[in-house]
């Protein structure tokens, strides 16, 4: 289970001032002139993905001024800079840092002409969220999609590295496999007997971190929205019971399922994770930032691609309203090496900085060091 005290303190530090199993690295190999995709080197083949199966993809085009982005972020986040705090809205970000408008329109048109349905066109104007049948995806990216199994878990993957059509030149694409899976650090032990030992409640944490003086000054999260990038939705009645038990204000719980059109559920895809991590996060974020609004954005499953769409929704759609973001899901960094999602996520999190969002990754667990090797 996550060490909630450290997590709560990390989130609080940003909220009160506001107004992702290890695996060794494998390189692509070439076979018959084509480079095999990394997940195609794992496990054994089960067969072919059904031609009619829905495949969701996330496309990231190069921005016109990508080379300037890091410098801009440094300027708006450094207290000594005259640009400090002059953050962008998602629309302003897209207007300046987005892809060339003609290239962006051509990419959208090319996808539509080849059977893709456009689900979202985020305001950053570099990204495209779409889906198509497996046979259309195979034809467009010139690679078969296979079903494979590795260590008992079934997954799908593109056999070869995708061939990106000219209209998408320079783009990276996630969703062609679901091999990499995120996980929480939650551990369940419902029959634990505390005995003579002590446990921590919200007021204990507030006392330990000397938060009470801040509360008295009105620094309690009021007017701030915390977003949670998660899988398996927390239930409002559970949060209400936690708040009632500890005499906390009834902080709102807002819920959104991603991608567009998916259904909100307490299950995390086909896994057994459930919603325990989401419940823990909603309980303790609102136990510390007691007047904040908590907005959970719930992935359809635990794959890295599922979380791409969640991150995008928070950065783009919620860019106007969300001040702080927490996520307790991740995986060993080596699992992500060479994946399109790594590039996509890095770009999205840099955009988040440009918008003034503060992100915390499993701050009470291993943070960003999920390999736990430093």
What does each of the following model-derived ranges do?
Residues 24-124, 129-374:
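Substrate-binding/charge-relay-adjacent region of secreted/lumenal peptidase catalytic domains
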Residues 13-21:
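C-terminal segment of classical bacterial N-terminal signal peptides
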């Amino acid at each position: 289970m996550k060490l909630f005290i450290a997590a709560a303190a990390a989130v609080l530090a940003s909220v009160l001032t506001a107004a992702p199993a290890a695996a060794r690295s494998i390189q692509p190999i070439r076979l018959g002139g084509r480079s095999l995709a990394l997940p195609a080197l794992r496990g054994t083949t089960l067969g072919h993905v059904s031609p009619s199966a829905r495949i969701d993809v996330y496309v990231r085009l190069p921005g016109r001024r990508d080379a300037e982005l890091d410098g801009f972020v440094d300027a708006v986040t450094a207290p000594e800079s005259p640009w400090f705090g002059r953050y962008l809205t998602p629309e302003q970000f897209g207007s300046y840092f987005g892809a060339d408008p003609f290239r962006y329109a051509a990419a959208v048109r090319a996808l539509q002409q080849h059977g893709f349905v456009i689900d979202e066109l985020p305001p950053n104007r570099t990204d495209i969220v779409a889906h198509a049948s497996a046979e259309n995806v195979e034809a467009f990216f010139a690679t078969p999609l296979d079903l494979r199994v590795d260590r008992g878990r079934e997954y799908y993957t593109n056999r070869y590295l995708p061939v990106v059509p000219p209209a998408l030149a320079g783009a990276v694409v996630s969703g062609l496999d679901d091999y990499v899976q995120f996980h929480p650090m939650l551990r369940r032990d419902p029959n634990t007997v505390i005995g003579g030992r002590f446990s921590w409640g919200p007021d204990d944490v507030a006392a330990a971190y000397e938060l009470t003086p801040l509360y008295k000054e009105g620094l309690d999260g009021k007017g701030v929205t915390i977003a949670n990038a998660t899988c398996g939705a927390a239930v409002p009645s559970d949060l209400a019971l936690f708040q009632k038990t500890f005499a906390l204000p009834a902080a709102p719980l807002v819920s959104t399922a991603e991608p567009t059109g998916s259904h909100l559920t307490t299950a995390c895809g086909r896994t057994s994770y459930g919603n325990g991590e989401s419940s823990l996060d909603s309980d303790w974020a609102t136990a510390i930032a007691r007047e904040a609004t908590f907005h959970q954005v719930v992935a359809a499953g635990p794959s890295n691609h599922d979380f791409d769409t969640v991150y995008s929704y928070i950065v783009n759609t919620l860019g106007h309203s969300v001040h702080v973001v927490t996520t307790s899901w991740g995986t060993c960094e080596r699992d992500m090496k060479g994946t399109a999602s790594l590039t996509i996520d890095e770009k999205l999190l840099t955009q988040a900085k440009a918008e003034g969002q503060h992100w915390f990754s499993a701050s009470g667990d291993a943070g960003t060091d999920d390999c736990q090797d430093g």
